Amino acid sequence: MNFERVKREEADTVLKLYRSLLGTPYCVWTEEYPSEKEVEFDLSRDALFCMRDDAGNIAGVISIDDDPNVECLTCWSETMVPSAEVSRVGVCQEFQNQGIAGKLLKGVMEELKKRGYQAVHLLVAKDNVKALRSYDKLNFENVGEC
């Protein structure tokens, strides 16, 4: 598996991956979100990454988000700046439970370090035990609920 930036011509593949996860356990996404708009926004900022299998297929995706509504939450550390939001983590169902989410998180954190970020934050549904387990393994700290 390799961590790479998603190519612009793969936008439809990413959107199909998002759609394939609708209705699965712990997924709070809808038909309206994430949409082509979010995929294009992420691609325009070189902020959409993936894990690829040995055949080059996308196994999972992750993005670096830029949402002012999330940035203004008061729970984030004011000493760890600049910080970035990690968002839209999704793993194809056939690749789930193989550590792909953890690899995506590690890869994006390395990318953020190269870009000069000091910290990472994210939002997750409090009942999404699979995601919470991945974040716990990487020593993420729960700083609040909203």
Model-derived regions, located:
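Conserved beta-strand-loop-alpha-helix junction that forms the acyl-donor binding cleft
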Residues: 122-132
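Acetyl-CoA-dependent GNAT
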Residues: 8, 21-88, 92, 105-106
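Short alpha-helical
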Residues: 9-13, 34, 129-130
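Conserved acetyl-CoA-binding loop of GNAT-fold acetyltransferases
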Residues: 19, 136-146
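A short beta-loop-alpha structural element at the N-terminal edge
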Residues: 2-16
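Conserved acetyl-CoA-binding loop-helix of GNAT-fold acetyltransferases
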Residues: 91, 97-110, 133-137
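Conserved GNAT acetyl-CoA-binding A-motif
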Residues: 105, 112-123
